Amino acid sequence: MNSLLMITACLAVIGTVWAKEGYIVNYYDGCKYACLKLGENDYCLRECKARYYKSAGGYCYAFACWCTHLYEQAVVWPLPNKTCYGK
């Protein structure tokens, strides 16, 4: 019984730790949202929270906004059948 309880607790922890993350993307052209200030960034945080209401954070990584703690159905880069200006 204790083993079953421990396994259930571990699975619950793993599920909360492995939340979805990804680059915020423009639905129309498939491009990532660009940013210049790397690291913690108010612009990226604001955009992530505006697009994905339950997003816990966002920062600039590789000159694009990276959103953290997203819900599983969140749409992130790359979009299927969408290329950023043919790139």
Curated annotation (Swiss-Prot):
Domain LCN-type CS-alpha/beta: 20-85
Protein name as annotated: Toxin Cll3
Main location group: secreted
Signal peptide: 1-19
Subcellular location: Secreted
Organism of derivation: Centruroides limpidus (Mexican scorpion)
Family stated for the protein in its record: Belongs to the long (4 C-C) scorpion toxin superfamily. Sodium channel inhibitor family. Beta subfamily.
Keyword set includes Disulfide bond: yes
Tissue specificity annotation: Expressed by the venom gland.
Listed GO MF terms: sodium channel inhibitor activity; toxin activity
Record-listed Tyrosine amide modification sites: 85
InterPro entries: LCN-type_CS_alpha_beta_dom, Scorpion_toxin-like, Scorpion_toxin-like_sf, Scorpion_toxinL
